[in-house]
C-alpha cells in the first residue's frame, strides 16, 4: 500500500463537503467521510487501476455521492489533488498543481 498525502486544496474540498452534508442531514457527513476513507484505501492498494484523465492525473469515482477524487502518483506516494463534486466546473481542479 502506498502512502497518501491529501494536499491542502483537497483537504478544503473535504471540509466544505462534510459541512454541507452535516447541514443537510444529521450523520450524512460521517457517511461521506467513511466512503472517502474507503476510496483512499482502494487507491492506496491499487493506484494504477483507475483511469487517467490527463497525464499524470487519475480519477476515482466515489460511490453513493456525486464526487470524483483526482490524484497523482509520484514515486511511492499518492497525492490527492481534489475531492470534487460532479457538477462543479472541472477547470477549477485542473489548475491545481502538485508543487
Model-derived features with residue positions:
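Active-site phosphate/pyrophosphate-handling residues
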Residues: 5, 66-68
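Short acidic-hydrophobic surface loop/beta-edge motif
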Residues: 58-62
Amino acid at each position: 500500500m502506498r502512502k497518501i498525502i491529501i494536499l491542502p486544496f483537497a483537504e478544503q474540498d473535504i471540509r466544505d463537503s462534510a459541512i454541507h452534508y452535516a447541514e443537510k442531514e444529521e450523520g450524512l457527513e460521517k457517511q461521506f467521510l467513511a466512503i472517502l476513507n474507503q476510496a483512499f484505501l482502494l487507491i492506496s492498494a491499487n493506484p494504477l487501476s483507475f483511469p487517467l484523465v490527463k497525464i499524470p492525473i487519475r480519477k476515482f469515482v466515489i460511490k453513493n455521492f456525486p464526487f470524483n477524487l483526482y490524484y497523482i502518483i509520484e514515486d511511492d506516494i499518492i497525492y490527492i489533488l481534489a475531492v470534487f463534486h460532479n457538477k462543479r466546473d472541472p477547470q477549477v481542479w485542473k489548475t491545481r498543481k502538485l508543487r
